[in-house]
Amino acid sequence: MRIPFPVEPATFLERPNRFVIHARLHASGAQVRAHCPDPGRLRELLIAGATVYVNKADNPDRRTPYTLRFIEHPANGQLISLNTQLPNDLFAEGLTDGFFAPFVGYTKYKREVVLPHSAPIHPNQNQSKSVAIVPNHTNLRPSPALSKGVSSRIDFRLSTEDGAVCWVETKSATLVHDDGRAYFPDAPTLRGRRHVEELEYLALSGARAALVFIIQRPDAISIAPNRETDPDFADALGRARARGVELYAYTCGVTTSRVWLEREVPVMLNNANHKDTKTRRKNN
């Protein structure tokens, strides 16, 4: 995927809050404020003196005139994308290009589909296939968000020519330890846990559901839930996997002008001695 805007190098100075960094542009020496799109802690990356890449905002009146897009790893120079909006675009591009073996045959998709809390998952003959509905299942433990009547959005609703449906959430990951293992999340994420619970709810109701981690760097060999940072998310992911949610992860190649899907790596849960839990679609 081509990056549709030019970026310029700068030196990272500080991060006064989750959404703002201060940096010094290499070309002019000017100190600038930049929006940080990744709300993770990024402690191993945002170290004073690190080289970052920013682009100028289109709106000259914005409080942060620049946006942080990439960073060079302070230890090894590895370029890492910090654009948390990019994984959905990469997933859509991968679907179109036939990159994902688990989703071959899903030729159509809708993005950001609202999942009402009170409707069934599979459309009947009187309902539009673009509307998500949830079944009345007496043995089903509903997602806390859905049970409270909160409408939620699922990143993708995939469908085949014969009407088979798969629900997909993507998650952006950037944290990779020295051993090559990536971890998610980098900060506690109630929203991320809710998404996992909703996928679990869909899977228990009989729908196909998958969580796809997009690791925005090429050096990861696997990914695991970050139990130290968010044990609740780790527990939710384990429950979801046990109840039928499929887990996949893919690394990315990264330059300042292009980011692309590169290869699949295993998703490893933190129990069972890090047993490989990479899943494939079940045969019906």
Predicted regions and their residues:
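Short nucleic-acid-contacting surface segments enriched for D/E, G, S/T with interspersed K/R
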Residues: 40-53
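Domain-level recognition of nuclease-like catalytic cores that cleave nucleotide substrates
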Residues: 216-271, 284
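Terminal, basic amphipathic appendages of nucleotide-handling enzymes
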Residues: 46, 55-97, 101
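Short, low-complexity, charge-dense intrinsically disordered segments
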Residues: 120-149, 272-284
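A short acidic/basic microdomain associated with nuclease active sites
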Residues: 99-119, 139-142, 146-148
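Short aromatic-glycine-enriched beta-strand elements
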Residues: 17-22
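Conserved catalytic cores of phosphodiester-cleaving nucleases, focusing on short active-site segments
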Residues: 10, 154-186, 199
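Nucleic-acid nuclease catalytic cores
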Residues: 171, 180-193, 197-229, 251
